[in-house]
């Protein structure tokens, strides 16, 4: 599950411009840009902020490409992180879990399988942070992404004690390649840079948000913004999200981060990494006689199975 970051820039330069023109919106009315992205999707960049997969000698190296959220190649690293946290409180607010989809296991996977990528990477960040950084011409991080997927705490910062216990090199890697100004949800990550002002024809006063994890943005979309309200965002995977004024350890959650959805509240996340994908898998495994019957009834396979 790898992607090419150039596709993201093509959408920014062409897709967004098309939407602005097709919607016939008055560009003077555009005052802000919100960014959401599926997480944890990780990108490795050089000193010029260029994705490493653009380097001619790295084009055939899969680890130079964007690691999509559902890349699960770092399971061994995730398991080891859990093992090293036994009898510690490092994962109390992560449900005593580490997911192979998260940033730190993916960094360790690259260290183990493609150390040359790690050596040449100047920046490692969430793809959502990459988009925000491109739009603002700055190197910034969102508290939502780095909090849920990078073991960063609003008060204590990164858990370097935990990182050192996992790998003595890890604190240095994170400090040099991941640390940057962290912007909270609800704040501005900066003004839209001149390049994109010109590309989109927008004002220099347009503000860009820090990126928010895509499922978390759904909480805002349905208006479940009060403490105690619960939202299930169902799709390829499913995220269960809730807000509260307190932070307490809860088993089986996958994180709780302050100010990550609504300022002043802790955002709690749990969920299932495969939901829609499992339905599709089940459909694709249906025997031929089921598929034939569904076709006879002019029904999708899953709908036909539900009626059996």
Please annotate each region the language model reported.
Residues 21-67, 94-101, 132, 136-149, ...:
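Short beta-strand-loop/turn "lid" adjacent to the catalytic site in phosphate-handling enzymes
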Residues 79-94, 105-140, 149-173, 186-308:
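Active-site core segments that coordinate phosphate-bearing ligands/cofactors
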Residues 1-23, 58-94, 102:
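Phosphate-binding loop and its immediate beta->loop->alpha context
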Residues 1-54, 92, 120, 172, ...:
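N-terminal glycine/serine-rich phosphate-binding loop of ATP-dependent small-molecule kinases
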